[in-house]
A protein has these predicted regions:
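Beta-sheet-rich sandwich/jelly-roll-like modules and their strand-loop junctions
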Residues: 22-124, 152-159, 165-215
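Short strand-edge motifs at loop-to-beta-strand transitions and within beta-strands
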Residues: 81-83, 142-146
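Solvent-exposed serine/threonine-rich low-complexity stretches and specific carbohydrate-binding patches
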Residues: 124-137
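Short, conserved secondary-structure segments in the cores of folded domains
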Residues: 148-150
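Positively charged n-region of N-terminal signal peptides that target proteins for export
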Residues: 1-4
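Sec/Tat signal peptide C-region and signal peptidase I cleavage site
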Residues: 17-21
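Short, surface-exposed linear segments at secondary-structure transitions and domain or protein termini
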Residues: 134-143, 185-191
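Bacterial N-terminal signal peptides
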Residues: 8-16
Length: 215
């Protein structure tokens, strides 16, 4: 059974309430599946500009993710998530893949966008698209693929953002989805000599890959 709970967040988000209200983002939780359908990761020969995706059979962690919610969703307010990345080389983005899952309420769709940076936070939209039909939360490892209409040049050493958001009104303003965590966000801990235990980091980094051409 899915659960919602409050946790800390270090990337960026946008809520429908004012910042001074001290809103904190909410997570989605599900029982991870024991059956993993291998992800299809850039079979078209594109190169990796950025990725925190795991191997195809474990591309992301299907048990936890940040909610992506519209203002009319069951959450009662909007919650949008942004993931920063910095290209190592001048590149051209042609495709973005993200681990978005459907949390069982509202229209099964959201808005993905590639954004500029603005003083360390999400800036202006470079290109965006409505993406639909996410796999159910608690399943792995189908990725949501967005092939950009126009290849977008990005500059080495400059921060950009991949953003998952929703419409403020109309179809999709009621969606309750989740951007699942990267498996590369795991760490081991050992308390009082009780043995090593794997756990998710408290940072909760959303899983995604940015692909294209690198001269």
């Amino acid at each position: 059974m899915k659960k919602l709970f409050v946790c800390m967040f270090v990337l960026t988000l946008a809520c429908s309430t004012a910042l001074f209200a001290a809103e904190v983002p909410r997570q989605a939780h599900a029982t991870p599946s024991v059956i993993h359908t291998p992800a299809v990761i850039h079979p078209d020969g594109t190169k990796t500009i950025f990725s925190n995706l795991g191997p195809s059979t474990n591309a992301y962690y299907d048990g936890n993710g940040w909610l992506v919610a519209g203002p009319a969703s069951e959450l009662g307010e909007s919650q949008w998530i942004g993931l920063p990345f910095i290209p190592a080389k001048n590149s051209t983005v042609t495709k973005i893949e993200v681990a978005l899952s459907y949390d069982g309420a509202g229209a099964n769709q959201a808005i993905l966008s590639l954004n500029n940076d603005s003083s360390g936070s999400v800036g202006t939209v470079i290109e965006q698209k409505t993406v639909k039909n996410f796999p159910n939360i608690g399943t792995c490892c189908t990725l949501v693929t967005w092939k950009l209409k126009t290849p977008q040049a990005v500059t080495a050493g400059t921060q950009y953002w991949v953003v998952a958001s929703t419409p403020t009104t109309g179809t999709g303003d009621d969606v309750l989805a989740a951007w699942m965590f990267s498996v590369n966000d795991w760490f081991d801990y050992n308390v009082a000599g009780g043995g090593w235990t794997g756990s998710l980091s408290f940072t909760g980094i959303p899983a995604a890959g940015v692909f294209g051409t690198i001269p």
